[in-house]
């Protein structure tokens, strides 16, 4: 069976999803999984994330080190998800057990952007036009921005 995905935005979309499920013939030897979840982060949210991370990486020295945007992403996602660390295989460092931002729901991603904004603002980050616009849209339109 091919994978079906429905974005339910109206009663008509909802009925289409219900109809698709009703067409499935149950087979106890080959169960089908139906998952209902909030949609994952959008490409627009991802663009906003990297604009903000770039600003933080250029302006914030973290414990005597300048981190790149990718490293900051790890720091922020670890803080948001209260993640854990484990020793690396060589035993000379640590690895953060994390969550991929591409798997985050829209609301989780919005929380991540809020965390970055609060952190950067506390440290006097001057937001670039792209990041500032992204943060203003988030403030104005909420998670849909």
Curated annotation (Swiss-Prot):
Highest taxon of the lineage: Viruses
SUPFAM superfamilies (UniProt xref): NinB
InterPro entries hit by this protein: NinB_sf, Recombinase_NinB
Coiled coil: none
Stated family: Belongs to the ninB family.
Protein name from the UniProt record: Protein ninB
Natural source organism: Salmonella phage P22
Gene: ninB
